[in-house]
Amino acid sequence: MSERDWHCEDPKQQLIWAAATSEALRVLEGKWKRVIICQLFAAKCPLRFSELERRIDDINQKMLIQQLKQLEKDGIVERTVYPQVPPKVEYHLTKMGIALGPSMEALIDWAFLRREQFIQEDKKQEN
């Protein structure tokens, strides 16, 4: 990953960065995509559909199928179908999906930092 010159005053470069950020967030948008990605990271091995479904509380089959298809289309998840009876289908992160790891960790760290800041501000207001 390269260092960005965040003080860049080139409007074209700023637009390129904004567009890239929007594209990345589009891939991750929705309630379930990040949960699916986190489950696949945590598993450290391919998961069958039923295993994913069991690991994710409150997701229905239709939504899981839809989200997996979108993640597959975006190159984040790969679906492997084994030619056997009964059919066996597994899902795993692609190289592009694995490359999301540091960004996901940075988002998690940022979210915890932000949450802690709000907690501290609430405590100050109570006093």
Question: Which residue ranges define each predicted feature?
Answer:
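N-terminal leader segment of winged-helix/HTH proteins
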Residues: M1-L28
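Non-catalytic interaction surface on structured domains
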Residues: L15, E23, P46, E53-R55, ...
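N-terminal helix-turn-helix DNA-binding core of bacterial DNA-binding proteins
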Residues: A19-M63, E90
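Canonical helix-turn-helix DNA-binding module
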Residues: F49-Y82, P86
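Basic, amphipathic "hinge/linker" alpha-helix immediately C-terminal to the N-terminal HTH DNA-binding motif
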Residues: P83-L107
